[in-house]
Amino acid sequence: KCLSIGIDITKEYIPVAPAAHYLCGGIKVDLDGQSSIRRLYAIGECSCTGLHGGNRLASNSLIEAVVYADAAAKHALSVLERYDFNEDIPEWNDEGTISTEERVLITQSMKEVNQIMEAYVGIVRSNTRLTRAWNRLDILYEETEALFKRSKATRELCELRNMINVGYLITKQAMEQTNKKPMN
């Protein structure tokens, strides 16, 4: 197979790149599927229950997802009546903003976030790479916030802001991590 795509494994390495699916993690939850943020639940691949230890990709076992989904739903229903909900939400006011004609700016910035995270915050990490990632994300953040303030909020623009914020969170956690255990 490798030869058919131009890679001679007797003369060169097989290129390997990190992919999001292979990174372990998730939102730490309790037995009710609730995160450290009150009333925020996480189940399935976005959660980290610890049920299977460190050798599982997040918490993506089907049985685990079903059990935690059931627990989260039961817990949420049991506390639902304790909370008031604000139903008096004003209409969105985008007066003074313009439609984002420059979609290419958003698309390119999304590609840059992906490239930054793959190149500097992937499997192989160093303080130099993490610092570079942080600085690059900072530039993208400033550019995106400026665009957001003058544009109508679109799904793509909101997703870009979220991508940058998640990039910041992952990078910050990686910079603070002192216990670098390999996964089993």
PLM segments and residue spans:
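Glycine- and aromatic-enriched mobile tails/lids
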Residues: Y22, K28-A42, C46-N184
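C-terminal catalytic lobe of FAD-dependent flavoproteins
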Residues: K1-C24, I37-R39
